[in-house]
Design a protein with these regions (language model features):
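N-terminal Rossmann-like dinucleotide-binding module
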Residues: 17-24, 28-95, 187
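Rossmann-like dinucleotide-binding domain that binds NAD(P)(H)
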Residues: 194-262, 306-309
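C-terminal capping/lid region of NAD(P)-dependent oxidoreductase domains
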Residues: 320-332
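N-terminal secretory signal peptides and thylakoid transit peptides that target proteins
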Residues: 1-21
């Protein structure tokens, strides 16, 4: 067994060779005949080998279980994993029944058909994914997509140039439950004031608001379907609350819970605030897993690039407000 590279040495090596080109535009895209991505839509018998970068997060073992143990998607298998430490990689390997550990992420080049990037801190995601982007490998990047919007714009611009499918989302947001809640709220006569509860540690070593923030911010983007213009955080030690104002006049209050791991949504009505609960049963496979696999097979991205980047812009504004204590504009 070769020595597992440290996260720092890996990122340093990748960063030296990373080139970006800058642009900002996005739309829903389907790569029917891209120059680099190879669609498996017409070859149902083709097996798709998946590699995962990052094993510190429990999601990695969960992906292994999904594909390798539960076999929810026949023909897809997680074949390789790289861990930030050898211990992380071995735990994911055991729990997810993943057959191979690599000592460097790039050892997976030429061996996989799809990539999942799954660091706990989003600042490592894009440098790790770049060599695979350049090879036309479809990429799912776990939340958060990245740590800075500008770098995300550059990465997605290159993805469009190379016609490499890329997506990223919170599994809480990209769910049948969230779309059901969105449908319920869209039919309400009054929805100007919304309150959402969810866990968030402003002092998390994995990027503060960027760690659990996507599970609160991305559902809002899906549900409200409008652009946030300004935010303000009220910090109380590592917890607190935040206010977000959207272009259409909707005002949202986020409550950062510290004892409850769940998420709740309330909308103000004439009778007071009413909790909106999903009315759909839990499905297997989940929408997040189903759309990820569909992209791996067909190249159809389930989410607009502009939507992904707007979520990062909101998180950056929240981070600035944590430090300033005041209102911060959301970069458009």
């Amino acid at each position: 067994m070769q020595k597992i590279f440290s996260r720092r040495s890996f990122i340093g090596n990748i960063a030296k060779g990373s080139l970006y080109s800058i642009a900002f535009s996005s739309s829903y895209r389907s790569f029917a005949n891209p120059s680099s991505f190879k669609s498996f839509e017409d070859d149902k018998s083709k097996k798709i080998n998946i590699g995962i970068i990052g094993a510190e997060n429990s999601h990695t073992a969960a992906f292994g279980k999904l594909f390798n143990i539960d076999n929810i998607f026949p023909g897809l298998e997680v074949k390789y994993v790289w861990g930030e430490t050898e211990a992380f990689a071995r735990i994911a390997m055991k729990k997810g029944n993943i057959p191979n550990i690599v000592s460097h992420p790039n050892d997976m080049l030429g061996k996989i058909d799809a990539l999942i990037v799954d660091h706990r801190h989003g600042k490592y995601h894009l440098d790790a994914a770049m060599p695979f982007l350049e090879e036309g490998i479809p990429i799912f990047i776990d939340k958060p997509f990245c740590y800075r919007k500008q770098k995300g714009e550059e990465f997605l611009s290159k993805a469009r140039q190379l016609k490499t499918p890329v997506t990223s989302y919170s599994s809480i947001a990209h769910s049948f439950a969230t779309f059901d809640i969105k449908n319920q709220i869209s039919q309400m006569e009054s929805k100007e004031n919304i309150i959402m509860y969810g866990p968030l540690d402003l002092d998390s070593k994995y990027g503060g608001v960027f760690f659990y923030g996507p599970h609160l911010i991305e559902p809002l983007i899906y549900i409200i379907d409008n652009r946030a213009v300004k935010v303000r955080v009220n910090k109380n030690n590592s917890n607190g609350s935040a206010s977000i104002v959207f272009e259409n006049g909707i005002s949202v209050t986020l409550i950062f819970s510290s004892k409850n791991r769940g998420w709740q949504t309330f909308v103000e009505t004439k009778k007071g605030f009413v909790e909106i609960k999903a009315t759909v049963e839990k499905k297997v496979p989940s929408k997040s897993d189903l759309d990820m696999v569909t992209m791996f097979k067909t190249g159809k991205e389930p989410r607009k690039h502009s939507n992904i980047l707007h979520g990062i812009a909101i998180l950056e504004a929240l981070e600035k407000s944590v430090n300033s204590g005041g209102w911060e504009n959301v970069d458009q």
